[in-house]
From Swiss-Prot:
Catalytic activity field: 1-(2-carboxyphenylamino)-1-deoxy-D-ribulose 5-phosphate + H(+) = (1S,2R)-1-C-(indol-3-yl)glycerol 3-phosphate + CO2 + H2O
Organism: Mycobacterium marinum (strain ATCC BAA-535 / M)
Protein's UniProt name: Indole-3-glycerol phosphate synthase
The organism's taxonomic lineage, starting at the top: Bacteria, Bacillati, Actinomycetota, Actinomycetes, Mycobacteriales
Pathway info: Amino-acid biosynthesis; L-tryptophan biosynthesis; L-tryptophan from chorismate: step 4/5
HAMAP family xref list: IGPS_B
Family: Belongs to the TrpC family.
Keywords: Amino-acid biosynthesis, Aromatic amino acid biosynthesis, Decarboxylase, Lyase, Tryptophan biosynthesis
Biological process, per Gene Ontology: L-tryptophan biosynthetic process
Amino acid sequence: MSPATVLDSILEGVRADVAAREALVGMTEIKAAAAAAPPPLDVMAALRQPGIGVIAEVKRASPSAGSLAPITDPAKLARAYEDGGARIISVLTEGRRFQGSLDDLDAVRAAVSIPLLRKDFVVQPYQIHEARAHGADMLLLIVAALDQSALVSMLDRTESLGMTALVEVHTEQEADRALKAGAKVIGVNARDLTTLEVDRDCFARIAPGLPSNVIRIAESGVRGTNDLLAYAGAGADAVLVGEGLVKSGDPRAAVADLVTAGTHPSCPKPAR
C-alpha cells in the first residue's frame, strides 16, 4: 500500500535512511560523538537580538519546487549568508527530496561561527544525537510528523543535549500541541506538508494565539523585504528563507537586504 500523503512518503524514506546510517554508526557511537562535540551555541540569544532575524537556508531542492540550485560549495554559501548578517544558518540534511546531507552540515559548521539549524524530518532519537554530533545548535521538530508522546520525548531529548528545538506547525491545533509539549520556539510553515499546498495567511492566524514568551518564526514565502515586513507586522521574531536566497544572484546581498529591512526603525516590532 502506498503512503497516504506526501509527508507519509517522505517519512517512509527518512526511516529507511536513518536505519541504514544507524547500521553503520550505532547509537552508542553517535551518543559518544555528540557528547564529544563542542558545546552548542546560544540560539535563544541570537533570536532575541533587536529586529527581525534572518535564518538563511542551504537548500538545493524541495518536493514542491524540484531542483532550486546545485550548491556545489555549501560552506561558501554559508559564509555569504553570515557576511550578509544572517543570525542562524539552516542546513537541509534530507537526501531524497531535498538533496541535502550531513556532509553539508559538517562543511557549514567548519565555515561559520553562528548557530546552525539542522532541518530534517526527525522521527527517531538517533537523529537528535546525530545532529549534535555534526555540530547543530538547533533542530527542527515537525508536529505533523510526530504523535504527542514522541513530540514531548524528542523535545526533551533535544534540550537535554543543549540544543534548541524549532517546533514547526501549520494549524492552530498543531500550535496547541507544540505549546503543550513545552515548545519555546515555534515556526509556522505556510506549506501543508501532507498536500504541499500553501496557505499564506497561516502565520497571521496562528501567531496571535501564541504566548508572548514564545519565539515566533515565519518559515515560508519570503521572497523579499515586503514579505519580511508583512510577517513582522503579523508578529514574527524571525523569518526562515531558503528558495529566495539560493536562487538569487548574490546571496550575501539578498540576506543583507532582508537584515536591513528587519532592523530598520520602521520595521514592525513583535507585540510582547
